[in-house]
Amino acid sequence: MRSRSSIAVWRSPTRPSRNAVLALAFAALAFAGAAHAQDAASAPKRPVHTFSIVARDPATGELGVAVQSHWFSVGPIVPWVEAGVGAVATQSFVDPSYGKLGLDLMRAGKSAPEALKALIAGDAASDVRQVAMIDTQGRVAAHTGAKDIQAAGHKVGTNYSVQANLMLNDTVWPAMSRAFEAAKGDLADRMLAALDAAQAAGGDIRGRQSAALILVSGKPTGKPWIDRIFDLRVDDNPEPLKELRRLVVLQRAYNHMNAGDLAVERKDNQGALREYSAAAALAPGSTEMVYWHAVALVNMGRVDESLPLFRQVFKADKNWLTLTPRLVTAGQLPKDQKVIDRILKAAN
């Protein structure tokens, strides 16, 4: 099986008092307002006109942002999400500092409405911003500036906000709201449904180019690389939502692979096989997944079951055949030459 590296994380030996936390929150609020005002005054106005959704799943606590725009590489600019803290979408003539500072304030104890109010108050150009925030308790706030290019608006609902600007018409964000509330599935499915509804209602008057989706766990570990369930970007594509959906399915498959690896580590062989099978069903063309499934079977002592999978992979690409003996030295396959020979003969 694939090994997992661990990184030691420094942790404070003492827990700060409630008063200390509150003091930090107020200090962060003052600092954020000053920093934001300075940033807003000097930063260029990036015209990331777009539609987006910020949302929380009340059942799981998951938080997410999904967005599409006719602007190159919208992913690094608009969506900001942190497990255990909140989610922010900052767009229109965008000031990215709303994302970082909004999360800073919510982390320090401010609600989403309090954080957004403070940042707007410190922004001399708030009339061209469009921002939405949600915190871990589902408290939501949104702002559409008076000078955002029309059609522009937002709608706040229970555990979500949808917002859009530079749209073909003013039916876009109401359509997003209806779609999100009616959609089935998990939070990613529902956010994608909202984006699809926006596009179907007319979408960005200029067209479409990029999209992104970030979704984090409702059970934060303090390790962002674990907490992020989806962190996907489509930077430049004529059909960004179709490509984003494809990536979501592929990410689900890899999530199953990771869950299978963890099951192997727990000696839960049946659980591992269920996860690997689920991954294969979602990504039937992936030789990578088939290969590591086969490796896991060998490490379970189920060599006979692994051979057809190895044969399938070796037929697709001989480089996997070259790789296989190297896994022995790396500790990913047993130091049993008879077993390795059987695997390699599967290529014949």
Annotate each PLM feature.
Residues 284, 318-319:
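Short coil turns that delineate tetratricopeptide repeat
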Residues 261-262, 295, 329:
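Residue-level recognition of tetratricopeptide repeat
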